[in-house]
Amino acid sequence: MQRYELIRLIGKGGMGEVYLAHDKACSRRVALKRIREDLSGNALLRKRFLREAKIAADLIHPGIVPVYSICSDGEAVYYTMPYIEGFSLKSLLKSVWQKEVLSKELEEKTSVKSFLPIFDKICATVEYIHSKGVLHRDLKPDNILLGLFGEVVIVDWGAAIFKHAKELKLEQDDEAAVSFDERNICYSSMTIPGKIVGTPDYMAPESLLGVEASEKTDIYALGLILYQMLTLAFPYRRKKGRKLSYRDVVLPPIEMSPYREIPPSLSQIAMKAIAINPADRFSSIQELRQALQPYLQGDPEWTVKATLMAKEKSCWKYYDPILLSRYFPVLASSPAQWYNFMLSEVEISASTRVEYTVTKSAVHEGMGILFLPSKEAERGEFYCGYGLWFSVQNHELTVSLIKNGIEIQKKSQEMISQQYRFAILIEKSDNRIAVFVEQALFILHIDYLPSLGNRLGVIIQDLQGMSNIAISESIGALRVSCLAVPDAFLSEKLYDQAAIFYRKIRDSFPGRKESYEAQFRLGVTLLTQIEEQGGDLTQALSSFDYLHGGAGAPLEYLGKALVYQRNGSFVEEIRCLLFALKRYSQHPEIPRLEDHLCFRLYDSLHKHRSEALVFMLLILWIAPEKISVREEKRFLRIIYHKQQATLFCQVDKAPLQFRSSKMELFLSFWTGFSLFLPELFRRAGELRDYQALADIFYVAGVSGNREAFMQFSTALANVSDEITFPESLHNQKVAELMFFVKGVEALRNKDYQKAKKLLWKTPFTLQLYALDIFHIQAFLDEEIESFIDLLQAIYDPASEEERDHILVYIIQTHLWNRDLERAYKLLNDRFPLDEELAEYSEAFILWGCYLALTGDRVAVKAHFSRCRYKYGKSALIGKCVDGDIFDYLDNLVWWEKKMTLFQSYFLLRCLNESPRRYEKYRQAYLSMENNFFD
């Protein structure tokens, strides 16, 4: 003890005393616990005291005070540990017992909301010691220390023991042989040889009967602690030797302290933990903690608000048959079928749970659950807001999530073939929708804007197969968002009131999430209000400037992207999203932008296919995990025609994989989105992927992006001596790529002889790429003879298979030179009109040009009128016969626009139109941007 100077006594128990001491060797304050002097001569108690110290020393957890040192030399038996400033849980509870009025500070400290995180920390510590095979056996508020800096630690391990300890039997034998003077011992607070272990008030009923301790005895003690935290009262007071009928006297916490606003389910958790029968308690601490998680996270508790009977018309405000709208998702059944539509009479809250069961047969033709804004629903606009569509086909359940008539998420899962009826639960709370089927989570969607749906709609054919619908609303959540009030105003389109409250919240919580979230929603409110009033949407931009550089900085650009989206400024929208994603890539709010990208992808698939490819590329690059395997197949079907019309996809016969660099290059090519090309080039170089490098050069060259082409050319030249391609690539050398690059540059500079010599040294694929890059320039500049010369030089040594790729260019030259006989022969031999020609194919356009040369304008118009897609590329080329098509180009993706302008120019030349007409298209092509952002 010479190393320690005792300062003062800070605690005393049945077996030991705890002092604040000064450690001279380390110059620090410590807590020193030593065995009481009057008990130090007892060998068994010394042994137990040391066991307590060793158990504490073996356990490493934030909720357990670590042991610095243990001493058992001579008569001195003690151990030391860190000194934690604070107070016991008992002292905190005692400070409010039987007090009618509490100070604001004490009321906050002892609120249910404040106590639950403390209780969870206690449980976490007990869960840890149980995992190590240790039972505490004396859990009580007196043994819970609350530090001044948030520490929550369990102390006093005197009663602790290993669950399967061999020494337990030895101690019991020792206890039988030891004589004790019970007059000197307060057995209510210590472990006594031959007596029941623990503090009677916190002991489980079975422990009082002498049953061996278990994890469930610790759970019982924790239940009593939780009970006290909830009620600020003890459920009963047990006297020594007195038997008590617990069931008659223990009131549930919600009845014991009704003024505490204890959620009923939380009250039930406490009662389950202190059940008399151990089998009725929680099976483990983990199960107890899981039961508490909804309250710790602020999740709501639900109470039934209304029960809707499907066949009872009085439950519904609107109850009529409807013809299923074509704007609902594509169904296995025909959308022309009639369905029953019901709109609830009762309004639903922002946090609502919908529960019902339905038969498999009732869902066979599909059924829908809709969350509709009241005003839109009353106007008959039944496809605003969110909706869910359920259908069963071939024992597979499919659930689609719809937003404003657009399918934004879809999931399918096999069902048990014998299953006749299944339960569906839908939770909608603020910005979250969760769908559970048979208690398993099926779909989870988070929208970072307040949901506007406050009416429930049902669409179903078979009313017999649907149970009553229970509508519940949340009550008693321990954490309610302060944004709920203005969100409610926004949902009712009371924009001015919503704006007032959003501003108040913003100003009340500076630097906190609530503040920047309120400002973001304020901006959305103003944007929506201006849009409804038909004003200038860009006025809403300034409201998002407030977020600049702050904790919610990414939301500035998300908000501005929303403004540009609604204003139709697609390029500016993409700029904002890209800036936020690049500058704040590690910011916790970035998932919101990723989710927004996903919504915009699905939204544009229905409204602006030309925009969809850009969002598809961004998601592949930034958040590929957002796209499911099922969606991959769907997207591959959408781009199939473009894939067939892409030269580097025609050359490489391997199927285009959705998650691949080639797909990213493909999307970059069609969208003109060149931002990712440098990274694709670097990646291909590192992988020594010859074909990928060639494809990237082709994309940069054919799109007219000379800056990128020269950048890659310089980079390739710098490493040409270092790169050697593997044998599997037929020993293709970087030199061939360099010849190709220099050959293309020679073509641009109109040094055609040099170009021919350089390209002669390259394989056919690179020659074909150079030919395709050059052919547009040749026709626009009317350098046809030079093009024919190069074409012939490549055609002559080519194989029959290779010549097939060149045939289109030969036909173009015949058409340009008005050689109808040769053009017709090649077209009719290889692409006869009596066969079904795909409208996206080059041959379809060339036939139109041939018919134009014959002078039969009626035949030209009839040919292009066959196009299935009214505003597709081929259809628009046909429209240029009678008028300009510039107003329709926004419906096309970037590369389609360029090719439409070029081919319209070519067609008008074949029609022998006036130079004034076809020159407009030529100039439009030449002036068109070389990439997405120019």
UniProtKB/Swiss-Prot annotation:
At the top level of its lineage, which domain of life is listed? Bacteria
Any idea of its EC number? Answer: 2.7.11.1
Keywords carried by this UniProt record: ATP-binding, Kinase, Nucleotide-binding, Phosphoprotein, Serine/threonine-protein kinase, Transferase
Fetch the InterPro entries from UniProt: Kinase-like_dom_sf, Prot_kinase_dom, Protein_kinase_ATP_BS, Ser/Thr_kinase_AS, Ser/Thr_kinase_PknD, TPR-like_helical_dom_sf
Q: How is it modified after translation?
A: Autophosphorylated on serine and threonine residues. Present in elementary bodies 40 hours post-infection as 2 bands of approximately 55 to 60 and 45 to 50 kDa, which may be due to differential phosphorylation as well as degradation; an enzymatically active full-length protein can also be detected.
| Residues involved in ATP binding | 10-18, 33
Q: What induces it?
A: Transcribed after 6 hours in infected mouse fibroblast cells, that is from the mid-phase of the developmental cycle.
Show the active-site residues: 138 (proton acceptor)
Catalytic reaction equation(s): L-seryl-[protein] + ATP = O-phospho-L-seryl-[protein] + ADP + H(+); L-threonyl-[protein] + ATP = O-phospho-L-threonyl-[protein] + ADP + H(+)
Enzyme class of the recorded protein, top EC level: transferase
**What is the role of the protein in this entry?**
Together with the serine/threonine kinase Pkn1, may play a role in the specific interactions with host proteins during intracellular growth. Autophosphorylates and also phosphorylates Pkn1.
PANTHER family, alphabetized: MITOGEN-ACTIVATED PROTEIN KINASE KINASE KINASE 20-RELATED (PTHR43289), SERINE_THREONINE-PROTEIN KINASE YBDM-RELATED (PTHR43289:SF34)
Per the record, the similarity remark reads: Belongs to the protein kinase superfamily. Ser/Thr protein kinase family.
Q: How does it assemble?
A: Interacts with Pkn1.
Among NCBIfam families, the record links this protein to:
PRK13184.1 (NF009651)
Question: What's the name of the protein?
Answer: Serine/threonine-protein kinase PknD
Organism for this UniProt entry: Chlamydia trachomatis serovar L2 (strain ATCC VR-902B / DSM 19102 / 434/Bu)
Phylogenetic lineage: Bacteria, Pseudomonadati, Chlamydiota, Chlamydiia, Chlamydiales
